[in-house]
Amino acid sequence: MSDITVEPIGKQMEKLILDVQQEIVAGLEAVDGQKFFQDKWTKGEGGYGISCVIQDGNVFEKGGVNTSIVQGKLNQDAVQRMRANHEGIDRTAKELPFFAAGISMVIHPRNPMAPTTHLNYRYFELVNSDGKKIWWFGGGADLTPSILFEEDGKHFHKLHKEACDRHDPTFYPRFKKWADEYFLIKHRKETRGIGGIFFDDLSEKDPQELFAFVKDCAHTFLPAYVPIMEKRKNMEFTEDDKEFQLIRRGYYAEFNVMYDRGTWFGLQAPEPRVESILMTLPLHASWRYKYEPKQERHKALLKVTHTPIEWC
């Protein structure tokens, strides 16, 4: 018999997100030249997290890389919503114990030539009243440019496809399509950006296999995003470009407060940490009545957000 003891997945995920958080913060600080403010917080029985935030940076107008490790009991409303995707959840329970560990990041650059980006990876488990554990992974990463550079979209998607392919060749086509559907701003009838990968309620393989997949994807972010930022952060732009960026930021805010699952879950949790949950919102955004894009490069983005394309 082997003497090797494998840590519970929840503990492995906790360590991973804390490591990835500091890795990403260091990588983005190298791009910006300004440090992130790191705010460690605690909550309830052993719950804690670290909010790493940059605001009014040299390159990044606003951004945050947050981790949270929380446990407690889900209220009946949250339990009911989760039952839709998990048949095994106890239908008679009014509340259930849960554990969640996740990392969430949104970065809004100053320069409209540089894309906003988002990342989220999480592990969730519930314990039914009979003691049975129900678990799943969720997450993904996506790119939201204002000015579309096809080479950036190809690079970002290519690296995430390679990460997916190392674990299951069906993952990228499935999760790319899922991202296109999930990031749809329904009332606008267009997507938030140019997608990436997205998955949720993922429990179809051994948990250790899925953890390895999530770990690979999480470490893919910096090489997928930093080269794009280095090319775009100092490019010249016009007032029209900036106006278009602010309009797109408004769309971003609409999606996050109306449709984003993480925002909804965070605000439903007992005593939500609102500052961290709403960290995803841009510092500045704009809504103009009957706005029409003025330049062809702005219209080029809309072709892709209205009809998502294959990038690789």
UniProtKB/Swiss-Prot annotation:
Site (Important for dimerization) residue list: 187
- Where substrate binds, per the record, is at 104, 120-122, 271-276
**PROSITE patterns reported in the protein's UniProt record:** COPROGEN_OXIDASE
Main localisation, per the record? cytoplasm
Q: Which EC class heads this enzyme's classification?
A: oxidoreductase
Write the signal peptide boundaries. none
Give the catalytic activity: coproporphyrinogen III + O2 + 2 H(+) = protoporphyrinogen IX + 2 CO2 + 2 H2O
* SUPFAM superfamilies in UniProt: Coproporphyrinogen III oxidase (SSF102886)
- What are the subcellular locations of this protein? Cytoplasm
Q: Which GO terms describe its molecular function?
A: coproporphyrinogen oxidase activity; protein homodimerization activity
Give the active-site positions: 118
Q: Important for dimerization: where is this region?
A: 53-62, 252-288
**Annotated EC:** 1.3.3.3
Tell me which GO cellular component terms the UniProt record holds: cytoplasm; cytosol; nucleus
Annotated InterPro entries = Coprogen_oxidase_aer (IPR001260), Coprogen_oxidase_aer_sf (IPR036406), Coprogen_oxidase_CS (IPR018375)
Keyword list, A-Z = Cytoplasm, Heme biosynthesis, Oxidoreductase, Porphyrin biosynthesis
Q: Name one GO biological process term.
A: protoporphyrinogen IX biosynthetic process
Under the heading Pfam families, the entry gives: Coprogen_oxidas
Q: In which pathway does it act?
A: Porphyrin-containing compound metabolism; protoporphyrin-IX biosynthesis; protoporphyrinogen-IX from coproporphyrinogen-III (O2 route): step 1/1
NCBIfam families per UniProt: PRK05330.1
Q: Which family does it belong to?
A: Belongs to the aerobic coproporphyrinogen-III oxidase family.
Q: Subunit composition?
A: Homodimer.
Summarizing the function annotation, the protein's role is:
Involved in the heme biosynthesis. Catalyzes the aerobic oxidative decarboxylation of propionate groups of rings A and B of coproporphyrinogen-III to yield the vinyl groups in protoporphyrinogen-IX.
> What name does the UniProt record give this protein?
Probable oxygen-dependent coproporphyrinogen-III oxidase
